[in-house]
Structure formats: C-alpha cells, structure tokens
C-alpha cells in the first residue's frame, strides 16, 4: 500500500535542504527508486508509462525554480503520466563523476532504456551539456538542450572564461564531448540566444545533421527561466515526447515572447543603447496598447517629448 504522505502530489516547498532531500527521496522510493551517486549526485526514478523523460537538474535549481520544490520532470509525470529519471547534482558539476558514469553503464547493461517506447533527455546550461552527453546511453532518443556547453576542455574551448574552475576536470574520458554523443540520437534540439556570444559559439559546435539549433535572440542568459515564463517549455517537451517537435512548431510557440516582459524590457534597453528612438517609440506604443506596462509608458512619454523637441522624427500617430 502506498503512503499518501509520500505522493509526488505533495509539495516540498518551504523545507530546509536536509528535510527537502529526505522527503524527495521518500517520494522517489514510494513511486520508483532512489540511487545515491557519491557525494555530489543522486538519482530518482518515477515508474509510470512507456515514455521516459530523463532530466538533469541541480538541488539549487529545483528549490529555486519549482513552486513545489520538485524536479522539473515531476510536472510531466503528473500531467502526461510519463516515467521520469532525474539525475541531480549539488551545484554545477556538469555531472563529470565516475559514479554517474557507472550508473549509466549499469542502466545500459540492464537494458533499462529499451523498456520504453520513447526517451527524451532534457537539461539547461551544465545540465544541458549532460543531457546531450549521456543521451548516447539511449540510442534513438530525442534531446532538448537549452544553452548547453559542448565541452569545457580548454584545448577546445579556451575562449570560454566563465568556468575556469572546471579546467582541472576531465571532459575527454567517458561521455565527454557532448556533440559527438548526439550521433546516436534520433533528433536533438539546441536552444540558444545568438546574441550571447559564448553560448552561440558552443551551439555552433553542436552542428550535426540530426541537430536543430533553435535561436532565441534577445532573450539573454537565462533561457530556461524565460521558457517557463512563456509557458512553452512543457509544450516543447510534450511535442518531443510524441515525435512532433520541429523548428516550425518551436517558432510558433516562441511567438509568446511578444508578451514576455523580460524579453520586452531587453528589447527596449537594446533600442535605447543603439539610439533607435523611432523603433523604440513603435515598440513602446505596441506594448502599452496591449498590457499594463508603466515603465514602457514612462519611456513612451519621454520619447514623445524628445520628438516634440525635434530630436528625431516620430512614427505616424496610431489611429
């Protein structure tokens, strides 16, 4: 008999870290399994239907980004009835750990991934790297990686100075160079902002026949958060789970950026920085006509005063 107090429907929000981990482990054990993977990693598995979502997440990300302080994949379990394997790290480790290698070796040897009709790997940033790298364990999988690094091997990516503390970590042994690990995937989708130079350079390393590089220009360096805000990340994974994710489908969903305040603010700031008052006025008019946006209203008023002073020729007034 299942213990209702350990249902994944029970929120873990508000707990301290130790109690949170204990409750998460209990939920995993009640509905599947829990596997410790050394000091900095552990795995949870929820056993449901024949579609498996494999996510790579961090303790900090789960506790910060999830309203229920649960792994991202739990929402897909609840909504879609999917099975879910979550590999969790304490901090950003890029999952470069022999215990994690061994765990995936064990899954491969047991034919674990072969038990599922569809397997989807997902992660963002360092977790996106891991989603791509470990997807080789499940040939034919679909991979969705948001802002992934291809490798942090300094011989290949010495231009990336963001993660110099990882320079002593090997990215050349097991499950190492993420783009090569995608060769066994059915399809992979790498989501990035081309205006984030280092992210774009990593994205270029993923160029493969089976990889679609999906651009989110102007969205900044927190794409997973923006995707959640726009309510399209779950839709992306849902389409991936039924083999219907495509570039066209992604860009249709991405139209939601027009209502994303973070994106609109970045656009306004960019137009200010580029000294494009004409376009900025058009943008501010559009935003204030559709939503309550005091900052855009104030900027529009300021631009109108500049235009009246003859600083620039304004666009025609809206009818």
Predicted feature locations:
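Extended, composition-driven regions rather than compact fold-specific motifs
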Residues: 1-110, 114, 140-319
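Alpha/beta-hydrolase fold nucleophile elbow
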Residues: 115-125
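Glycine-rich nucleophile elbow surrounding the catalytic serine of serine-hydrolase chemistry
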Residues: 123-135
């Amino acid at each position: 008999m299942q213990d209702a107090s350990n249902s994944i429907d029970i929120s873990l929000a508000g707990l301290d870290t130790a109690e949170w981990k204990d409750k998460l482990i209990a939920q995993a054990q009640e509905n599947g399994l829990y596997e410790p993977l050394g000091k900095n990693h552990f795995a949870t598995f929820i056993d449901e239907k024949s579609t498996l979502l494999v996510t790579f997440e961090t303790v900090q990300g789960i506790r910060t980004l999830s309203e229920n302080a649960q792994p991202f994949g739990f929402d897909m379990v609840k909504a879609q009835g999917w099975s879910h394997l979550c590999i969790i790290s304490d901090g950003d480790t890029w999952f470069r750990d022999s215990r994690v290698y061994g765990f995936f070796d064990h899954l491969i040897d047991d034919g674990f991934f072969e038990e599922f009709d569809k397997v989807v790997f997902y992660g963002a940033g360092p977790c996106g790297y891991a989603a791509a790298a470990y997807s080789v364990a499940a040939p034919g999988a679909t991979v969705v990686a948001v802002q992934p690094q291809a490798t942090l091997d300094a011989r290949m990516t010495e231009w990336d100075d963001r993660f110099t503390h990882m320079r002593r970590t090997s990215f050349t042994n097991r499950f190492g160079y993420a783009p090569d690990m995608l060769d066994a995937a059915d399809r992979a989708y790498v989501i990035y902002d081309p205006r984030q130079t280092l992210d774009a350079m990593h994205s270029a390393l993923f160029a493969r026949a089976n990889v679609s590089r999906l651009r989110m220009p102007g969205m900044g360096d927190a794409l997973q958060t923006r995707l959640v805000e726009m309510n399209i990340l779950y839709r992306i994974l849902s389409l991936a789970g039924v083999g219907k994710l495509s570039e066209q489908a992604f860009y249709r969903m991405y139209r939601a950026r027009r209502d994303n305040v973070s994106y609109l603010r970045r656009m306004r700031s960019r137009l200010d920085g580029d000294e494009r008052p004409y376009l900025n006025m058009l943008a501010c008019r559009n935003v204030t006509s559709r939503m309550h946006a005091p900052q855009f209203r104030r900027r529009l008023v300021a631009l109108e005063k500049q235009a009246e002073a003859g600083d620039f020729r304004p666009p025609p007034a809206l009818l």
